Amino acid sequence: MIVRLIGIFLLLLNTVEAEELALGASKADAQATVGCLFPMGGRGGIYGQDSVTGIKLAFEHLKKQPLPYPPIRVLVSDSSSKASKAARQVRNFVRKDGVRFICGVVNSAIALQVAEVAEEEKVFFIGTDHASSKLTRGKVRDYYFRVSNNAEQSMQAAAIYIKKKFARGPRAQPLKLAYIGPDYDYGYQAWKDLRARLDAEGVNYQVETVLWPKLYEPDYSAYLRALVDKKVDLVVNALWGGDLVAFIQQANQTTLFEHARFANFDTGGNYEVLSALGEDMPEGLILSSRHHNNWPQTDYNTWFVERFHALTGRYPSYAAEGAYAGILAISEALRVAGPEASDQALRDALSSLHLKLPEDPEGFISFMNPLNHQLQQVIAIGETVPDQRFLPARMMLGNWMIYHPQLSNQPE
């Protein structure tokens, strides 16, 4: 009985600690406070854990810079991947902790709700992971800025890639295309963005089937049968994280990869997926991600990846660099505008942001589009090739095709 009570106490203690994690400056020394929302346990827990390490690396990086940055305090709360909880947490951050910035959020459906609350509370929401283009389309949100690729950008690169790799003349048979994505906003927007970009590029294609498994679907057998039966040329998959891992593991038991090319242009190349699959990752899949551990091969990216590994014993998922970018963006805005600056001054600083990140190749610096508050970044699409430098992954991406941002094609 005593052992059981101790176990319950430790579980509750760990939960409290996870919800009250504080990083950076002390409460007394901080000139600004940031509230970050990430899933810290369950199927999406690796994103939160990696994000926390990314925040720590951001503080390390800032300490090395010649220019002084205002000290900031970062509070990390476990969103549990629940929209209602995340909305309450934002209000608690503002009213209890006096935060001026919210950062993070993995799930796009949750991000949409958090963005609404942030606008109501008049605090800046720096999106670091979610990718629905709905947040940066239409009327600009005064308090929302995103520092990782959105689905619009990924699908723009995807359409150019498809046009080059699967070119079909106007008189040839159209490319037979299938799409499978999660049954919520991110999946819907990715499909909408892909079709819009394929049409804009003049790609001759024909949609054979569109499938919508629910988030965290355990059994993809019915969806796999539908894809195999259609005999398509290209399957575009927009699942992510554990869902994509489960899909590929189950697809390995079918003939899907034998008769169709497979692509995931936004999240498929995430190291989390590559490492989880290990030897089960097939060769020749077309994948991309918001950060790659083996591209670009710059000193900055090497430092980020190796330092992350030194701290954790594993290599980073893209969530780590997203959180890293979020803290750098907030710090840079505070440095430029000042910690006591008005909302408009901070908005101007974020709108004109130029931020050198680990994912930036030589000669390129990520920059904010002031028209929609979406950071503009280079996108690298590759194919899985044998590479055991980043174990437990047995496949990494190679055969790269690189796409620089085309600002004129971004939504206003």
Q: How should each PLM-predicted stretch be described?
A:
Residues 310-320, 331-393, 410:
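Segments of small-molecule ligand-sensing domains
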Residues 19-25, 46-53, 61, 65-138, ...:
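Beta-alpha junction/loop-to-helix N-cap segments that form part of ligand/metal-binding clefts
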Residues 88, 134, 142-253, 294-303:
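Extracellular/periplasmic Venus flytrap/periplasmic-binding protein
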Residues 93-106, 126-128, 176-181, 231-241, ...:
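Periplasmic-binding protein-like
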Residues 1-33, 412:
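Short, low-complexity disordered leader/linker segments with a strong preference
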